[in-house]
């Protein structure tokens, strides 16, 4: 499926697709006729999974819809976690592979990039790979989404979850930090989940207190469109000038450092082949090749 609105097909009544730009399309009938083995055979290559701008359900890309202010004018809660990338970064990252990949990908900007995402050891290379994925795939996207809510009147409430769920030594996720989905049991006040990665956690009173607070925010938001209420730390609507988020760590506070976007702006926004659109602080990139092949490299690791 295509997630880029600039790449569309001209499907005629015979069901034939005409490729107008990358990636290549095939007729819907052919896709429906594919066997399960055919589908499973190509599944490992489908790194990205995003909405398709089909001109009907989605008349345009999500980015363009928000840029034009055509999204539903309703409040939103959005956010990301401090260590989103730990669950998506392979252990096979190597020091040489990481450094060579950065130099190949970023050319004259490589040294600046490496100063921001350094790698002097295999462990540091892996940690930097985690940070790249966390920033580019989650942190940047959530911040951009919050900024683009300026095109409508409803507010966005941005959070940054940095609490590391406690886990017994030896647990498969014990060293994953504030990993992808770590906030979910807190939000729904349910520490009894039995599926990984949130099972077998040694949640304590700090966790239960955070959970009570987060669940209250979500209940208030569902009822009124505003997460705030009596006894809760004030959660301000996102203001691009203040650039703050509600940080949920060992305590709850409003924090500018939680956004952690200085490094992604510095390291990525000035790359020569990326066109940054400064419109209410939002950024996009110019081509399918740049957008998707670059992120595929970042996601899969250079090692």
Each language-model region and where it sits:
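Residue-level detector of intrinsically disordered, flexible termini
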Residues: 6, 10-13, 28-35, 52, ...
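Short linear motifs centered on Gly/Pro in flexible linkers and helix caps
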Residues: 6-8, 131, 285, 293
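Mobile gating loops/cap/lid regions near enzyme active sites that modulate substrate access
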Residues: 140-143, 147-303
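Substrate-gating cap/lid region and adjacent catalytic-acid/histidine neighborhood
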Residues: 8-206, 217
């Amino acid at each position: 499926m295509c997630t880029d609105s600039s790449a569309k097909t001209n499907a005629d009544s015979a069901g034939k697709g005409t490729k107008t730009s990358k990636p290549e399309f095939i007729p819907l009938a052919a896709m429906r006729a594919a066997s399960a083995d055919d589908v499973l055979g190509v599944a490992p290559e489908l790194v990205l999974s995003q909405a398709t701008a089909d001109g009907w359900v989605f008349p345009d890309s999500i980015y363009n819809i928000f840029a034009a202010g055509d999204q539903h004018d309703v409040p939103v809660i959005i956010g990301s976690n401090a260590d989103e990338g730990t669950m998506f970064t392979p252990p096979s990252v190597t020091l040489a592979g990481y450094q060579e990949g950065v130099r190949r990908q970023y050319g004259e900007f490589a040294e600046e990039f490496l100063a921001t995402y350094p790698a002097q050891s295999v462990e540091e290379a892996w940690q930097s790979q985690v940070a790249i994925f966390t920033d580019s795939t989650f942190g940047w996207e959530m911040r951009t989404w919050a900024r683009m809510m300026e095109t409508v009147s409803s507010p966005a409430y941005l959070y940054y979850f940095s609490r590391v769920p406690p886990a017994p030594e030896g647990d498969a996720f014990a060293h994953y930090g504030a990993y992808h989905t770590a906030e979910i049991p807190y939000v729904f006040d349910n520490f009894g989940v039995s599926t990984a990665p949130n099972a077998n956690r040694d949640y304590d009173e700090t966790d239960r207190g955070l959970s009570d607070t987060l669940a209250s925010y979500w209940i208030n938001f569902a009822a009124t469109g505003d997460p705030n209420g009596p006894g809760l730390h004030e959660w301000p609507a996102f203001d691009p000038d203040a650039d703050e988020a509600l940080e949920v760590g060992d305590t709850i506070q409003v924090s500018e450092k939680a956004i952690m976007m200085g490094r992604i702006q510095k390291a990525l926004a000035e790359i020569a082949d990326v066109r940054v659109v400064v419109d209410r602080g939002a950024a996009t990139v110019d081509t399918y090749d740049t957008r998707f092949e670059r992120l595929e490299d970042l996601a899969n690791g250079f090692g």
